[in-house]
Amino acid sequence: YPESIDWREKGAVTPVKNQNPCGSCWAFSTVATIEGINKIITGQLISLSEQELLDCEYRSHGCDGGYQTPSLQYVVDNGVHTEREYPYEKKQGRCRAKDKKGPKVYITGYKYVPANDEISLIQAIANQPVSVVTDSRGRGFQFYKGGIYEGPCGTNTDHAVTAVGYGKTYLLLKNSWGPNWGEKGYIRIKRASGRSKGTCGVYTSSFFPIKGYR
């Protein structure tokens, strides 16, 4: 795997989105990984619908939080519409997937990255954007302005984001708090730092979608 990678430079990352005030980070993280693999496989970068997951993926809890695996499974089973077709409303509503027209993006499966294993995660990110979790509760994270973040934070995670690259000393994470947060909506978080769970628990629960050629 390369020493560093930034999927933004490869055109596989849509502009930073904003989930607020809804607790829908899980949908944004999942969708960003699917936008990424879809671009890698098809050559097209298409902004996809978080709102569809919020409204239609019933195993998660809408604006009260959700999960990486059921949301990925939803897209395996149903596909996901584009952002344009099913735009974000900042709140959970009735599932309108059946009423929507236009193309959908599908994935064929998803895979779990071995937990608390830096090299496995780096190898995964070298291939595509990956859904990861962090502890975002601390003021340092909430009000992060730039640089390589080392904490303070715990490893009890509460927030899903998307790893879209790495360097020698950091992971590059796409957040869903709008472009005015952090480094234009991104955070660089310190790699390894002697904690097997990673800085802010970033190595504890990571998934990526698999997409065949369809």
Curated annotation (Swiss-Prot):
Keywords, comma-separated and alphabetical: Disulfide bond, Hydrolase, Protease, Secreted, Thiol protease
Top-rank taxon: Eukaryota
GO molecular function, one term: cysteine-type peptidase activity
GO terms for cellular component: extracellular region
Stored PROSITE patterns: THIOL_PROTEASE_CYS, THIOL_PROTEASE_HIS
Binding site for E64: C25
Transmembrane segments: none
Keyword Hydrolase on entry: yes
Subcellular location: Secreted
Main location: secreted
Documented EC number(s): 3.4.22.-
Gene3D superfamilies attached to this UniProt entry: Cysteine proteinases (3.90.70.10)
InterPro entries: Papain-like_cys_pep_sf, Pept_cys_AS, Pept_his_AS, Peptidase_C1A, Peptidase_C1A_C, Peptidase_C1A_papain-like
Any single GO BP term: proteolysis
Protease in keyword set: yes
Positions of the catalytic residues: C25, H159, N175
Known tissue expression: Expressed in latex.
Cited PANTHER family: CYSTEINE PROTEASE FAMILY C1-RELATED
Functional note: Cysteine protease.
Family from the record: Belongs to the peptidase C1 family.
Protein name, as recorded: Mexicain
